[in-house]
Each structure stands twice: as C-alpha cells, then as structure tokens.
C-alpha cells in the first residue's frame, strides 16, 4: 500500500520524497582495457560541475536551520574563549574578611571597567563581549569621576550578578531572550545572600586597587576616627630613615588577628597604644608604638604584615608628631577611654605636653647653660654645638627651650664665642707644665712611652740630645724655641710632629697663606705651633721676617678685624725636606734652629699600620715618665693635697626651693 502522507495532490512515485529509486550501473569498460591518457579530457564537457550551483528557490526553509547552526556555533565559540580567558587570568587577592570569594565579580568586564581615578571620556569597544541579560551594549563609556565607597560597592554587586548571567549557557532560538531574562532573575534570587557576604571583599578590592589608594585610606581613616591622619604624624620621605616611635594604621584585618595582635606586639615594644574599630572592610587597627630598637618604615611594615596577615599597601605608617600639643592630647585622652589598649610607660613627649607638672616646668632659654655645656664638652665649633645640644632636648629643659626659640643661630654663635673666650683665658693663666698636666688629665687610659723612644732610635736620633732640646723648647729659652725635623719624604716627620701637636693642643700654620697679613693669627691662641713642609721660599720668608719669632721674643701679630697683638711667640716645630744649615743664604738662622735628621723610611706592618704607635696615651706616658728630666713643675704637692681650684662654672647658683 502506498504511503502518500505529507504530499499534496497526486504525484508519481519518483516525485515522492519518501519513495524508492531504481539505480542501474552501466559498465562501458572492463578490467584490462586500454584507456587513452587524454580520453577523459576529450569527453569532459563540464556537465559534472552543474551540481555545485545552488539553484534552489529562495524561501524553501533551509536557511533558518543554517542560521540557527551558525548562532549556536558562535555561542559555543564565545563560551570557549571566556573559559580560556578565565583559566589564564591571574587570581585576584581577597582580604581575610572575605568568606566566599566571588570570581564572577572579579572577572566581569563591567566590574573591570570601574575605576576610581578619572578616565578619558572616549568610548572604547571591548573585544569578546557577550550580550548580557537583555542589556548588552557594544559601546562602553569609560569615564568615571570621583565616587563614594557605597556607590562602588553597589555597582560591583550588580556587575557581579550580570557576570554570573554571562557565564551560564544560553538558548539562541526565538525564545532566547525570555530564557535569558528568566535565567538572570533566578541568578539574582539565588545569589542575593552571597553578594551580601561579599560586600566587604568588593569594597576592599575596588578601593585598595585604585591608582590613588593612599588617598582612599586617608579618607577612610578620617571617616572612622574623626580626624585626619596627617594631624597625628610627621612625614618621612625616605623608607630607610629610622625612628623608635611609629604610628601605624592597618585596614582589613581579621577580627581574631586584631585581638591577638595586642599580645603579640608586646615583646617587641616598650610602649603600645592600640585602637581597634570595625568597618565594612573588616577591622581597622590604629597603633602608636615605641619599639625597643629604632626601625625604618620597611622593617615596621614587614613586621606588621607578618603579625596581621595584611599586605603592606593596606597600611599607613609614619612617625608621630613629638611637639604637637593637640596630637599628644589625642593620644592621652584616647588612652583613658575603653576603646584603647595601652601598656608600657607613656612616652616623655606625651607626658611633657599633657601632665600639668611637666607643663609648669617649662622655662625660658638660658644662654649660660648652653655655654656651660659647650665648655664642659670642649666644643667651639658652631655646627657641632648646635647638633649636640639639640640632641639633649629630650632630657634637658633648656635644650628643649632652645629648639622652641626663633633665635637658634644667634644663640649658637654667642655660645661658641663665649666658650672660646673662656678657653683662651684658661689657657693664658697656665704655664707650660700646668698645661701639659691639664692636657694629660683629659686623656683616658694609660699608654707606653717606649714606642716613642724606639722610633727616635730607629731614625738614628740620640735620645739624650733630643731630650735636652725638648726641655729648652718647652721652657721657651731664647734661640732654643724652634725644633726642625729634616729628612727625605716618607720618613715620618709629619706623623711624629702631628702626634705631639695633638697631645699638646697646638695649632698649624701654612705658608700657602703667607700672602695674607693674618696667616700667623692662630699662634696667638696656642701654646705650641707647627709649620709643616717648609720649602726654600718659606725659609727665605722666615729669614727675612721671622727671626725674632724664632728667638722666642715678643712679636706683633696682625689679627683680622682686631687691633695688633703683641705677645711672645710660642715654641714652633718645623718639618722640611731641605737642610737649612747647609745653605749659606740662611746662615743667620743656624743659631736659632735645633735640627734632627730622619733618614729612614717609616716602617709599616703587613696590614699597613704604623709599626711604632704615636698616640695621645703614649705621649701622656712619655711626659709622666720624663717629667723631672724635662724640668717641669713637680705636681706631687697637688696630688697629695688634691686640686684646690674649683672647676669652672659660668652658670649662676640656684637656691633650693622647698614646697
């Protein structure tokens, strides 16, 4: 029975789509027949290419299936591309407060387009963009202005939901839009709880990954604590600058770590003031800490990152303001509240500015106390005095008042000037024996006098003649007050004289300044002088102008901006490579000079150190050993009875006030 279902009207059997066809094969050639090489070309009329032309009538319904197939293939390709992109994209960082990380929110193209910084207003086309749940766009305006934290979190949540919709499978048929809307609606209802739990992670990741994350942290600090972070700190530009006191604010900390931090930080610190507040990012920890050893910013950041498991870029680290009364009052008042954990002794800079007793102790600056400090520490250089006295501000009230004054440069200059006057007056009232004893008492430790004698013997210098010349030299006997050390280079002449000059506190004059009228001015303030490396021109100058100075008689010295000074020239040491006794030009200097020759090269050890050590301790031992031989004043009576003179004091006495 024929099956005519699905056909219209009567048709033959061959025209039916479901009928059977009879196919017969016609064999023109058999196996083994010879075939010409060009037979196919001659018989080919091109009729076999007719089947490649599609001459079907338009609208027969097959293009719908092809379009559907293309759409399905395109959808599958897009899903594969997104899968590859997600596979090779770096995993984002999640704050410890994030319970359920949302990968869809992090990898969503819409969330990635959100930036806190100002972007260009030019619209850009994104590659591989999938149409979302009925709101897909091919143009995305990347301009974003300043936004609040709450707006960014909301946008991140919405985009996370849309990203989740994009990751699901889609139907591209006629009902595709309805299925997408239904799938998107189901996703929102099912992910409402997870989006709410991920609000903290969205806020931290959206804000702390911004280009200007420090400004964001500063704004969040002011929102939480009610004041600016810069009002409590002073800025260190270098991360290598060390300080013992630091203010550290850490954002996004686990609640359990924030509580345990109060105990973990104690072994490292002498004082710690800890405040813990909660916010939508997690726990915020504000700490004022004084470490047992001074640390730089990098060391502090690494330590806090280890204790709190938070990246270093989630921290604000600066030293506190030490001379700000409002800042000190803030730390003092918050330490009394129940929101702070405090242990250790309160820093002195807080006590000084908050406790009434310490505030009353602040006094005006006294120049005499600064002069006394410079005199006691033998400081006559202005820069050294300013630095050393400023370091005493933490323990000395007068030094603190000095730092608070507006005339520091004037005070330093006046203090150094007065200290030099006192030192010069003290030196002028001493003879050479008292001066040597005074210089020796300042040197700590005992040395050995033998290296000095051994070095003189190494240079073939007779010790007894040298001792006699040194005795006359120290006593200032006329025509015996100048000792010359002559010899070739590298024999230790300058080393020997410089070590003796340092012990006696002498001065050095240089012939290079001889064109000035004031080049001899240092001799007016010293007990001994040194002219190093005298040349032939220098000897001619001495022979012409300084004969009476070598005699040890009274000379007149010109001083800058002062009147001429008449004084007895102090004993003078001279080193030279020219023998002044062998030249007839300087025959009048022969009776005024005591010459010792150093012919041997100065010996050194294998490490490059001097074989003979000539230091202050050895010279102290040398003078103590040969005190009587040098005919110096015998200090035995003073040692037995003690020093009757009182130490110099330029600070007026104070009466003790009873309470």
UniProtKB/Swiss-Prot annotation:
Cross-link (Glycyl lysine isopeptide (Lys-Gly) (interchain with G-Cter in SUMO)) at residue(s): 568
Species for this entry: Human papillomavirus 3
DNA-binding region, as annotated region: 196-362
Membrane spanning residue stretches: none
Post-translational modification Phosphoserine, affected residues: 91, 95, 108, 121
Single annotated GO MF: DNA binding
Family: Belongs to the papillomaviridae E1 protein family.
Motif (Nuclear export signal): 107-116
Pfam families (alphabetical): PPV_E1_C (PF00519), PPV_E1_DBD (PF20450), PPV_E1_N (PF00524)
Keywords: ATP-binding, DNA replication, DNA-binding, Early protein, Helicase, Host nucleus, Hydrolase, Isomerase, Isopeptide bond, Nucleotide-binding, Phosphoprotein, Ubl conjugation
Location of this chain's protein in the cell: Host nucleus
Protein residues bound to ATP: 487-494
Substrates-to-products reaction catalysed: Couples ATP hydrolysis with the unwinding of duplex DNA by translocating in the 3'-5' direction; ATP + H2O = ADP + phosphate + H(+)
Protein name: Replication protein E1
Motif window: Nuclear localization signal: 85-87
S-S bridge residues: none
Compositionally biased region (Acidic residues): 36-52
GO biological process: DNA replication
Described function: ATP-dependent DNA 3'-5' helicase required for initiation of viral DNA replication. It forms a complex with the viral E2 protein. The E1-E2 complex binds to the replication origin which contains binding sites for both proteins. During the initial step, a dimer of E1 interacts with a dimer of protein E2 leading to a complex that binds the viral origin of replication with high specificity. Then, a second dimer of E1 displaces the E2 dimer in an ATP-dependent manner to form the E1 tetramer.
N-terminal signal peptide: none
The organism's place on the tree of life at top rank: Viruses
Subunit structure: Can form hexamers. Interacts with E2 protein; this interaction increases E1 DNA binding specificity. Interacts with host DNA polymerase subunit POLA2. Interacts with host single stranded DNA-binding protein RPA1. Interacts with host TOP1; this interaction stimulates the enzymatic activity of TOP1.
Main location as per UniProt: host cell
Domain SF3 helicase: 461-611
This protein's GO CC annotations: host cell nucleus
Post-translational modification as stated in the protein's UniProt record: Phosphorylated.
Bias (Polar residues) ranges: 135-160
